[in-house]
Amino acid sequence: MNKQTDTGKQIALQFIPIVLIVFTLLSCQTFVTETATQAQNAVAGSSEIASTLPPLPPTFQTTLINPLDIPHTYVDDTCRYIKNKWNTETSAPPGTVVMILMIGQIQPVGATEPGEITEEDFIRTMQELKSQGFEAIKMKEFLSFIERNVKIPARSVLIIQDGNYDQSYFNRYYRDYWKNWGWTVINGWQSTPDVSKNLWLENIDMEFEGMVDHQAQGVNPDTILSDESAKTVIARELQGPLDVFGINYGKNPLAFIWPNGGFGQRPVEAARLLKYQLGFTANQRGPVMYNWIPLANEIDPNRLNYPPEGKIDDPLMTLPRYHASDAFAAIDQVRAIGKEAAAYAMDNRNIELEYYDIVCSEDYGRIPTIP
């Protein structure tokens, strides 16, 4: 009797592994089936979402600039762009436009060289800017706007005075605007070794007063950087300002004003490695807005002195500037472009917000002030 019982137990024990294997296989089959079903449902859900997604509008275009000057965008994250664009708590409203001025030298009379402007024409330009509702901004404000769409005046102007000048020059041409309107002027400072102690001290005083916001414009006033420039020349022009700005101005420059308008792929990449965040050319292409920079991809036979910058693919390091002598005539154009851009944005607002709600809201959160 005990022998039969033992035999039965042995047979039962032999069947246990088989039962476990069968059970495991069945469980795996169920898991695979469930996983496959979930994947099919996910694909179906994704397809359903994709089919309901509204197509985003193309980049704003305008006929008010040269057709070869094509608006370039630089914000790759669509969700972040839409949130920055429509967050009315902290963001500049669509159509906020910045006119960037390049001033070589203001002459009492008889401006004849490129970049020069007479004192009379300069005063007329500044008064027209103010009467048209423009306000001057500092480089740090411009950087916050152009990178993240942080609020600035809807019509802003960035006034860049190229080259080194003493206090008497700035007092004569800029102090009244600082005193009466609070307008700061950006100075493209050339960090030449032979700058006199007195010139340094005068500019340091104006920097800490707030009237002048110094940024880097290389070392040698005659340098024109390009892709053919030697590594040592590129390094000298870009590193030189970093060596002296901290000691004298108590800051690192945010921007590099390309000396004499010369730039290239290699100089731009080197500037980025040295932590420059903005670059300004001498190319006159139009105003700039958040995620909207007009640049050329090809050489324009009618403007051979404007090297194309679009293919460098770094719009923030190749920003255009209006020449001082042409600024007055362009003010209405800049204002009109801002109005066109605002109207275009409002026409497409609901489409962008619907896209954001479907694609972005779960990860990026609700856009403040929009239910």
Predicted regions, residues:
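Bacterial signal peptide processing site
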Residues: 29-31
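A structural motif
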Residues: 203-224, 233-240, 245
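N-terminal pro-sequences and low-complexity stem/linker regions of secreted or lumenal proteins
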Residues: 80, 119-122, 183-194
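Substrate-binding cleft of extracellular glycoside hydrolase catalytic domains
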Residues: 141-142, 154-183
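C-terminal active-site subregion of NodB/CE4 polysaccharide deacetylases
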Residues: 42, 48-159, 228-255, 261-371
